[in-house]
Amino acid sequence: MRAELAVYFIAGTQDIVRGTLPSVLEEALKAGITCFQYREKGAGALQTASERKEMALECQQLCAKYQVPFIINDDVALALEIGADGIHVGQNDEEIRQVIASCAGKMKIGLSVHSVSEAEEAERLGSVDYIGVGPIFPTISKADAEPVSGTAILEEIRRAGIKLPIVGIGGINETNSAEVLTAGADGVSVISAITRSEDCQSVIKQLKNPGSPS
């Protein structure tokens, strides 16, 4: 799981500023993302279940083509219906114990955490496969984001002895990803670093190899 978190792309139709979600996703897949989470939320998101399912299936097929895990955000029913590789939920989304009861053994389970105590609880649950920690830096992609924690939260979680794979979340881009990895994350998740980039390939190359020239 740790290797799959290296460059974890998150997006929904609301994040796309040019082209379409499938076209941006395929470009990112070609460039080397290691995981994709379909997150359809907020202003500009698809509103009907049928639209979301149709888009999810198109993105899932692209991920399968490039052998990259396809994860759905906060929609257990859809994830189970289409056989997603994983489900990711936040602290205020579907109750994590219900998610575990429905999904454990069928797909990977990811949980967002914002503190050491939440990370410890995720590890105690036993069926959480990885945690998303953040927001590390200020983000424009999530209107209801928690307060920024900085990279210190990653160091604190690792000092607490938590062994779960960690992907950093929030405001991460090719210029600051190395800080996130140095602080203890196994990978970085990005939205706007890819969706708003005019050179997706260069951005992903730098995310995969922090410090490398573009």
UniProtKB/Swiss-Prot annotation:
A GO BP annotation: thiamine biosynthetic process
Entry keywords, A to Z: Magnesium, Metal-binding, Thiamine biosynthesis, Transferase
Binding-site residues, Mg(2+): 74, 93
Residues involved in 2-[(2R,5Z)-2-carboxy-4-methylthiazol-5(2H)-ylidene]ethyl phosphate binding: 139-141, 171, 191-192
Keyword Metal-binding carried by entry: yes
Swiss-Prot/TrEMBL catalytic activity: 2-[(2R,5Z)-2-carboxy-4-methylthiazol-5(2H)-ylidene]ethyl phosphate + 4-amino-2-methyl-5-(diphosphooxymethyl)pyrimidine + 2 H(+) = thiamine phosphate + CO2 + diphosphate; 2-(2-carboxy-4-methylthiazol-5-yl)ethyl phosphate + 4-amino-2-methyl-5-(diphosphooxymethyl)pyrimidine + 2 H(+) = thiamine phosphate + CO2 + diphosphate; 4-methyl-5-(2-phosphooxyethyl)-thiazole + 4-amino-2-methyl-5-(diphosphooxymethyl)pyrimidine + H(+) = thiamine phosphate + diphosphate
The protein's annotated pathway: Cofactor biosynthesis; thiamine diphosphate biosynthesis; thiamine phosphate from 4-amino-2-methyl-5-diphosphomethylpyrimidine and 4-methyl-5-(2-phosphoethyl)-thiazole: step 1/1
Catalytic activity, EC: 2.5.1.3
Described purpose of this protein according to its UniProt entry: Condenses 4-methyl-5-(beta-hydroxyethyl)thiazole monophosphate (THZ-P) and 2-methyl-4-amino-5-hydroxymethyl pyrimidine pyrophosphate (HMP-PP) to form thiamine monophosphate (TMP).
Name of the protein: Thiamine-phosphate synthase
Species for this entry: Listeria innocua serovar 6a (strain ATCC BAA-680 / CLIP 11262)
Gene: thiE
